Amino acid sequence: MSIFPTRDSRDLSSRRRSLIDWEFPQMALVPLDQVFDWAERSRQSLHDDIVNMHRNLFSLEPFTAMDNAFESVMKEMSAIQPREFHPELEYTQPGELDFLKDAYEVGKDGRLHFKVYFNVKNFKAEEITIKADKNKLVVRAQKSVACGDAAMSESVGRSIPLPPSVDRNHIQATITTDDVLVIEAPVNEPNYKAIKLSPEKGLAIQPSEVQERQLAVKNKEGLEIVTAEDGSKKIHLELKVDPHFAPKDVKVWAKGNKVYVHGVTGKEEKTENASHSEHREFYKAFVTPEVVDASKTQAEIVDGLMVVEAPLFK
């Protein structure tokens, strides 16, 4: 299925401002307090946000370079057999997959959306075609320019990984007046109750506080890869958490092929003659052999043990 972009009468800055200046619908599936918090902090950092968006635009490249770039990304996402995978020995640097951390936002329909941006300067909307398949999003642009009696053809494109949770039947694409192609689509059935949005960490998950566990416990601290009967894979992470940390004090998020866990809590007591403050914090990072589908992450804390599960995708 091909998607053809339409023209937007606004530039990227105006479009971004409209996203955070409208009244969020009461039927929003993302918890409203989180939506308002995300919107307020986004308003405060709007200028920096726009600068970063322009800096991180995907560029279109000649087809050969495009294929090589996607092949490089897919190698970065290649699976490693669980028995050969040792997270403590792995080391990764920021790469092309890091865009996934910031690729989720609340849409005007109150749902979680996957959204990416491309630089399409010098191309018209009718010269651009977008296709989505099982594991990637492909943008192609082609035009011919008359040069005397001859015609020169320019063909460029870009492929990026597309999470399986993205609703491929509702992908929309628009081009702003400053030549930015915006592609977005809702996410299928994300874990709305646990979602936490922030400009700093992007999409994060807050562990649930449950009386009875929904996730299996293996009593083996650390991260491992579990393969289901249908061949799909997911991470299973168990981590002991100090009793001082409530579920609301802990956040889990993914960036590229790493999963991060951050907990912070504190209290301040004041009397007439003295004051006392207490601050506790921990930070953990785990490398995964593939990329985590962050919108489908589940996490819970019971009796000081946190369990996290999230599907992987290639």
Swiss-Prot record:
Disulfide bonds: none annotated. GO terms for molecular function: unfolded protein binding. SUPFAM superfamilies: HSP20-like chaperones. Residues 95-200, 216-314 form the sHSP domain. CDD domains: metazoan_ACD. Keywords: Chaperone, Cytoplasm, Repeat. It is found in: Cytoplasm. Pfam families: HSP20 (PF00011), Tsp36_N (PF20894). One of its GO terms (cellular component) is nucleus. InterPro entries: A-crystallin/Hsp20_dom, Alpha-crystallin/sHSP_animal, HSP20-like_chaperone, Tsp36_N, Tsp36_N_sf. GO terms for biological process: protein refolding; response to heat. Has chaperone activity towards unfolded proteins (in vitro). Homodimer and homotetramer. Not precipitated by antisera from cattle infected with T.saginata, suggesting that the protein is not accessible to the host immune system. PANTHER family: HEAT SHOCK PROTEIN HSP-12.2-RELATED, RE23625P. Belongs to the small heat shock protein (HSP20) family. This is Small heat shock protein p36. It comes from Taenia saginata. The lineage of its organism: Eukaryota, Metazoa, Spiralia, Lophotrochozoa, Platyhelminthes.
